[in-house]
Structure formats: structure tokens, C-alpha cells
């Protein structure tokens, strides 16, 4: 199975951080390893190396953390001075990053019975997030098979 540039990036990131199984995927551990400070508030945003996560369920907070880390690792610049289309692009990229960061392909491939429930339980994400990530994974497999 081929990996996209983003999947390679996340695979290498996790290998560098010695993260190799879903039980290691936690905000506290990854924040420490990535040297970012995490705070909780009414909205999610990134300010330098400080990640503010909107208070919510554990699953939603993990997903928001993935989104903000996407900005932290992959984007530079101030949203206030950017064109709306570029902001939208960066938000789309951060969303896509979150799906792969929270449910890395190299770990997903190790799940025995891949379905929405097992993804949700294994990676501690909510149902919709798991459903979307499963769709992404299935589309990738379908594309790879040439059908």
C-alpha cells in the first residue's frame, strides 16, 4: 500500500517520537514530546507553541488537538493578514492532518476488524470522525486496487 506525503510525514513524526501504538496517542504525551503547552478554553486555537483546546468530550478534545497540531507543524503566518481562500485551504489541510494524526494509517492497518466502532474505540475518537477516516481509508484501498 502506498503512502501519501502526509501519511509519510506522520509516520516519520511518530517514529521519531517513539510513538508506535494507539495507546500512546494522548494529548499530554504528544504535547510533551512536541514541546507545546496545552490550555483549555472556550475555543480552539494556536498561539506560537501554545495550543488552546475547546473544552468538550475527551474524543473532541483529541480531534481538536490534532487539528491545531496540524497548524503548528505545517503552517506559518498570521491568519489576520491572509486571504480568505488561503485561510480556508489551511483549515482544510489542518482537518485532513487531524484525521491522519489522530488515526495514523500505519496503526490503522494493524487493526484486526476495521469498522467504525473499532476505530472509535481504538483511537478514542467520536463516531463521525471514525466514519470519515474509515471512508478515507477505504477510498485509498479502492484507488490502490484500480477498481
Predicted regions span which residues?
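Active-site hotspot residues in diverse enzymes, especially metal/ion-binding acidic/histidine motifs
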Residues: 1-147
Amino acid at each position: 500500500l502506498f503512502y501519501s506525503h502526509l501519511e509519510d510525514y506522520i509516520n516519520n513524526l511518530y517514529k521519531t517520537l517513539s510513538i508506535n501504538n494507539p495507546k500512546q496517542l494522548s494529548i499530554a504525551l504528544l504535547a510533551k514530546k512536541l514541546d507545546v503547552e496545552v490550555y483549555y478554553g472556550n475555543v480552539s486555537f494556536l498561539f506560537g507553541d501554545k495550543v488552546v483546546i475547546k473544552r468538550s468530550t475527551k474524543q473532541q478534545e483529541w480531534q481538536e488537538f490534532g487539528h491545531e497540531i496540524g497548524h503548528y507543524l505545517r503552517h506559518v503566518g498570521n491568519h489576520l493578514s491572509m486571504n480568505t481562500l488561503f485561510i480556508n485551504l489551511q483549515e482544510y489541510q489542518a482537518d485532513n492532518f487531524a484525521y491522519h494524526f489522530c488515526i495514523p494509517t500505519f496503526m490503522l492497518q494493524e487493526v484486526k476488524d476495521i469498522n467504525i466502532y473499532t476505530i472509535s474505540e481504538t483511537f478514542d475518537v467520536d463516531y463521525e470522525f471514525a466514519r470519515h477516516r474509515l471512508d478515507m481509508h477505504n477510498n485509498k484501498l479502492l484507488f490502490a486496487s484500480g477498481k
